[in-house]
């Protein structure tokens, strides 16, 4: 039996009108069609979104196959119902507001949070990695903080928004940060402190319940996992697998460091926020802040390469080191979702070209 932690992935997708590219409220019909094909799609806050979830996985090859199948079934279900499925952090074109999915909980969120909720047609990717306890998940979260902005830059896939270049590689992360319980995870000294903070947010009305604790790392409230949710939904299956594998190795590395009593990298909230902003703006082909060592600004690809080396023992234990190095090099050379969006947009400065690019990438092998 392997000592490696199991993992799983959730991906959120947009449903858009095939003719106009605008988000289209078809999630219930699409989910019903997918269910007939054996795939359970979850309804998200807005009715132009669906979410897939893999089974519990123990290797990246099976994860790749599962993600591809889920994306293709969801794509077919969308087309059956007159919609197009996009793996994108934001729609390249967007209406004034997104219709809220009509469930009691989502209606309550829409009523309490107003325009924040009604502009919430954004899509991320969440990776769950097995941990021994809830307390372990919180301690792992503390140790992942210096690396999250690098994963954000790597997976950026929301550059084009409202028919123009947003100026950010991931504008999704900027919009997401408006929620009072979103963004980089705070540092917690204990499980008790975590619980007290969550209780305070709920008492203040900043979250309905612990399901609305949207920090980019959190202990799952459903599974024995730590959940890393910093990413835009990646454009391709290959990029999602790369992201998930890095997260799995990072959790393993953090767990080992905790066991060995290694010091946690001290980070103030404003430094972490600055690194997030820099990574969100510049993306993979820009520069960001080295939070692990110098706090100097350096090329993002250099810091990502250093990150992979930091994870090398865990990646080698998983048998993934060479694969991850090769896949990272490929993404650096060919571009991630944000870079592909911009290349498509620059051809004619038409959002339709971006949508075509995203739709093809969504189901590419």
Curated annotation (Swiss-Prot):
**Which keywords does the record carry?**
ATP-binding, Ligase, Nucleotide-binding
* Catalytic reaction equation(s): L-cysteine + L-glutamate + ATP = gamma-L-glutamyl-L-cysteine + ADP + phosphate + H(+)
Q: Which Gene3D superfamilies match?
A: 3.30.590.20
Domain of life (superkingdom): Bacteria
UniProt xrefs under SUPFAM superfamilies: Glutamine synthetase/guanido kinase
Q: What is its EC number?
A: 6.3.2.2
Mind telling me which InterPro entries this protein's record contains? GCL_type2/YbdK_subfam, GCS2, Gln_synth/guanido_kin_cat_dom, YbdK
Molecular-function GO terms, alphabetical = ATP binding; glutamate-cysteine ligase activity
One of this protein's GO BP terms? modified amino acid biosynthetic process
Q: What does this protein do?
A: ATP-dependent carboxylate-amine ligase which exhibits weak glutamate--cysteine ligase activity.
Q: Which HAMAP family match?
A: Glu_cys_ligase_2 (MF_01609)
Which family does the record assign?
A: Belongs to the glutamate--cysteine ligase type 2 family. YbdK subfamily.
Q: Supply the name of the protein.
A: Putative glutamate--cysteine ligase 2-3
Q: Which organism is it from?
A: Mycolicibacterium smegmatis (strain ATCC 700084 / mc(2)155) (Mycobacterium smegmatis)
């Amino acid at each position: 039996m392997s000592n490696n932690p199991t993992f799983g992935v959730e991906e959120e997708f947009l449903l858009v009108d095939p003719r106009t590219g605008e988000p289209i409220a078809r999630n219930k019909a699409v989910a019903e069609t997918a269910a007939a094909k054996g795939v359970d799609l979850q309804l998200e806050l807005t009715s132009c979104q669906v979410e897939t979830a893999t089974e519990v996985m123990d290797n990246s090859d099976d994860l790749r196959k599962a993600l591809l199948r889920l994306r293709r079934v969801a794509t077919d279900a969308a087309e059956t119902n007159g919609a197009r499925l996009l793996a994108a952090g934001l729609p390249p074109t967007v209406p004034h507001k997104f219709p809220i999915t009509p469930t009691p909980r989502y209606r309550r969120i829409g009523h309490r949070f107003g325009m924040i909720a009604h502009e919430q047609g954004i899509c991320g990717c969440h990776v769950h990695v097995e941990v021994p306890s809830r307390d372990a998940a919180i301690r792992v979260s503390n140790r992942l903080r210096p690396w999250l902005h690098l994963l954000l830059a790597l997976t950026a896939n929301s550059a084009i928004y409202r028919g123009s270049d947003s100026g950010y590689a991931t504008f999704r992360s900027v919009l997401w940060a408006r929620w009072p319980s979103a963004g980089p995870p705070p540092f917690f000294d204990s499980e008790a402190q975590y619980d007290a903070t969550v209780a305070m947010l709920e008492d203040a009305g900043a979250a309905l319940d612990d399901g609305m604790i949207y920090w980019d790392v959190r202990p799952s409230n459903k599974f024995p996992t730590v959940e890393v949710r910093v990413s835009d939904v990646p454009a391709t299956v290959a990029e999602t697998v790369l992201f998930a594998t890095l997260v799995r190795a990072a959790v393993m590395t953090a767990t080992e460091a905790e066991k060995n009593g290694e010091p946690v990298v001290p980070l103030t909230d404003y430094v972490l926020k600055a690194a997030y902003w820099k990574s969100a703006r510049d993306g993979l082909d820009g520069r960001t802040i080295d939070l692990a060592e110098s706090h100097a600004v350096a090329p993002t690809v250099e810091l990502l390469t250093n990150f992979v080396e930091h994870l090398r023992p865990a990646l080698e234990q998983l048998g993934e080191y060479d694969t991850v190095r090769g896949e990272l090099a490929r993404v650096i050379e060919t571009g991630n979702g944000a870079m592909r969006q911009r290349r498509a947009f620059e051809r004619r400065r038409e959002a339709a070209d971006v949508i075509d690019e995203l739709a093809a990438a969504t189901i590419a092998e």
